[in-house]
């Protein structure tokens, strides 16, 4: 009896094994599936917590904190264009002057990366008042008799390229010089220039007060994200001054700045129009 049982059991095991090894027939060719792309997580930006310029609200180096800004007289005659360095100023004042012309006062809180600046022109009393409002070091080339009198009377820290020891006949030979390239095609009064590097290197050698006095506070305030608090959109502003000059300021939404005469974008500059009565 035992001999009959064993073959039966073995046959049953073989049958079960055969049934278990049979695979179902494929019903069709499976479609090729592309692997899902891996989406990299968006890195979180670290909020800037360093010093910002009190004149523009933009980041600046720690070495400029509490430093007096530099206010430079800039030529604005058509014959003197293009201007140099105005696009890197923190604040630009364009003020009507005599004869229907205007001149600009460019105020720089930080001079990092600022290249050639010019052409530098002469002082007038109303620009002195603007410079004093910022406790700025005033750089100019010449001036009216009234301006020279006010510089002495008001105690303006003024560096004069015409009647002072700040002019050189050679490039980078002093705080200011007459640009060799401009001298080839411009009148002499349109050739005085300086650079951010020259100002940085030479100001400490003049024995001037370079920092604001205790208690000084800048009167400008800026919203943290740069969003305007009110008003209408103004992509283009036209300011008629006289038969000679009409100021035009065009806003570039890509760079969030204006398009100045030298072809560079104004980055973060604050442009004030002051009508001198």
Please identify what each model-predicted range represents:
Residues 28, 35-93, 98-277:
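A surface/extracellular/periplasmic glyco- and lipid-processing/surface-interacting theme
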